[in-house]
Amino acid sequence: MATSVDNRHYPRLSSALNGGVVHSFKPPLVPSPSLDRDQDQSVNVPTEKSVDKTTKEDRFDSSDDEDESHNRYVSYYKEMVLKSNSDLEPTALDSRDESTGDKWIHRNSSMVRLTGKHPFNAEAPLPRLMHHGFITPVPLHYVRNHGGVPKAEWSDWSVEVTGLVKRPAGLTMEQLISEFPSREFPVTLVCAGNRRKEQNMVKQTIGFNWGSAGVSTSLWRGVALSDVLRRCGVYSKRGGALNVCFEGAEDLPGGGGSKYGTSIKKEMAMDPARDIILAYMQNGELLTPDHGFPVRVIIPGFIGGRMVKWLKRIIVTPQESDNYYHYKDNRVLPSYVDAELPNEESWWYRPEYIINELNINSVITTPGHEEILPINAFTTQKPYTLKGYAYSGGGKKVTRVEVTLDGGETWSVCELDHQEKPNKYGKFWCWCFWSLDVEVLDLLSAKEVAVRAWDESLNTQPEKLIWNLMGMMNNCWFRIKTNVCKPHRGEIGIVFEHPTRPGNQSGGWMAKERQIEKSSESHPTLKKSVSTPFMNTASKMYSMSEVRKHNSAESAWIIVHGHIYDCTRFLKDHPGGSDSILINAGTDCTEEFEAIHSDKAKKLLEDYRIGELITTGYDSSPNVSVHGGSSVMSLLAPIRQLAPTKNIALVNPREKVPVKLIEKTSISHDVRRFRFALPSEDQQLGLPVGKHIFLCATINDKLCLRAYTPTSTVDAVGYIDLVIKVYFKNVHPRFPNGGLMSQHPDSLPIGAVLDIKGPLGHIEYQGRGKFMVSGKPKFANKLAMLAGGTGITPIYQVIQSILSDPEDETEMFVVYANRTEDDILVREELEGWASKFPDRLKIWYVVEIAKEGWEYSTGFITEAVLREHVPEGLEGESLALACGPPPMIQFALQPNLEKMGYDIKEDLLIF
């Protein structure tokens, strides 16, 4: 989404000069989008100076008649901008951005966030987008950010032009606007992922859930890329100049750390018919931070992913860009290619799958999702008007839009509204709107309404969805379903359902159909008795407010992909402890569940499914509004919490807490200690000993969560420390891509923000030998502490707590297994404690591969190792604490501890 410095007036919307094709730019002082709104500072944009006198043939030469005509159209577009902004509310700082790098950006609160808090990826609600018409207000323009928004200053920004050019240059913003002719015209931008959620409802792609509003239109002003390249003396094709690469300013994690970059063919860059510009104004204002202030690339008719924001470098090269995002994004791979195959067989690097130009697409926007059309004497006297948008790529004009009410048997041609004038080469860069009047009684008898568009090349939309790994370029017929309902007073009506709702919002007919399909697979006999997909009574339907009531250990329900699961009987068996379920009880936890669970876990979940979520928007539950009195209390989390006497960060285990990376220390070649600042300097984390947290990040556009135990003390103020073993790619042959989450913080710059969530876990050490395990007290004065690899961190946490209390006399016996001696984590701290407290802590190591002179055990943890180094199992005297790989727990610890007298169910506590 775009940011607006304020809901401003437009004193700079002056008539275009010299035909609207070649302008001199005369803006007055304007606020810098990079500055805090409370600061009274401004950027002095130069007034008209001598525009570079390029030769006539270098210019966009046009006749006087064309110039005059274009002049009128630019004025017309500017009137549209004013009209579009007439009922736009001011933007504001958003509380969701407070602890991210984007906290300084003003945004429109109505934007639907698609990837959580950060990075900011958003689209406007579809009705709101269409309400503003042909020109989209900047704050409602869709936003695709791969990371944090760079802070930029107009006065010191420059764009480097280098590579195969005779005169490399660093062009300042002043030079761009004063030394080159400017151009101004409307362009529709579309994300290649527009309508992706429809694909995700069929089969999950690797992309997040764009709805059908990943499209927006603005009036852009900038300088021609071809003019800039000519000024710098771009080489000919024979001289090797085949590609023009663009690089932005943001720091991103992809490929181990990079900028966002991509490229286009040089002949495209130099083609005057393509109108490619380096834009610095949008809808009559300087660009806003979310849209690339101070300068970005605009390539009309292309996908948004080629239009690099915060442009810093233009490089002319023989080869296309080698940037990570050029290859690992914006591709349409064959439908059979899954998430593993592209890396194994180099599919990413095959040129035939790259996306450049947009394809033909259309969407129904009226009726809206869950809109109800009453059927009565008044409404049946006049037709109902269906409406929507359509666009195509490459400058092709949309020539026809058709609607069917009978599944494609017959089609009605719609009325088209093209509100743009083509450029002098006949190219159309913007969406058009369509409408069709239909009889209400025809809608009543229809089961669905579908639309398809055609362009001047007679390209049209396929009937069925074509799934691809990245979920790109979805342009199948857009279908809405109709159902008869009874809105009030005994009337009947038609309720319309769109296929999906953007982001993680529930609803849409595709969710219902998927539920029916899964139910039919589980109960084959249903297929014979179910006449329509909306009559399936096999699954009970529940409202969201009903689900919210089941948010305690007595009754724990969750929602995943629109299905409702009763996890109450699984609380005691959950490997991550009951808290991992309870913090999500009564909520839709689709994103969190997908981020941390395997396919096996997803299949296991089906045993607990009890019904489906009602997605029509009606709620028959008691009033839960402010006026509902005590009913509001039903929404409160059931997890018992003591009122905090200190300022703690983890107040609510259901909420994410942003933390900033402030220090990174290399302990070994693959082990890092990361220090994160808590939101407030006087805060403690508030994590009970024995519990852990989730570290949350959006990686490659998907939420990723991993459990970690801090190594900082529980009373540390203002920060937490995490010791993480980094599993690098191309090290282990079984895992060529390495660890997704472990590599992520290592690739981040200081100052980057991640989220944490917790406390989680079923074990809590309460001090002096006392534990609380899944709500049951346990006691021991001797602890067998058994760890493998990174599993030492929860053990470390308990040791740290015990040794910090002089009156805690609990004896600890640690056996710590690793592959090699170099893999031993926090060894210095462990041995320091063992030396200082020899009567309270004893350490023994086991390594699979030992160096010469190794003083400890070699191989694996065996019964002999345990008998020699940990106490026997005695009821009320000893407990075993363990954390490590499942094979170690299952084959090395459980059978051998049982031989030593431990009750595996009661005396072995597994973190």
Swiss-Prot record:
Protein name: Nitrate reductase [NADH], clone PBNBR1405
Sorted UniProt keywords: Disulfide bond, FAD, Flavoprotein, Heme, Iron, Metal-binding, Molybdenum, NAD, Nitrate assimilation, Oxidoreductase
Residue ranges annotated for the FAD-binding FR-type domain, each copy included: 654-766
Ranges of biased composition (kind: Basic and acidic residues): 49-62
BP GO terms, sorted: nitrate assimilation; nitric oxide biosynthetic process
Residues reported to bind heme: 574, 597
Subunit organization: Homodimer.
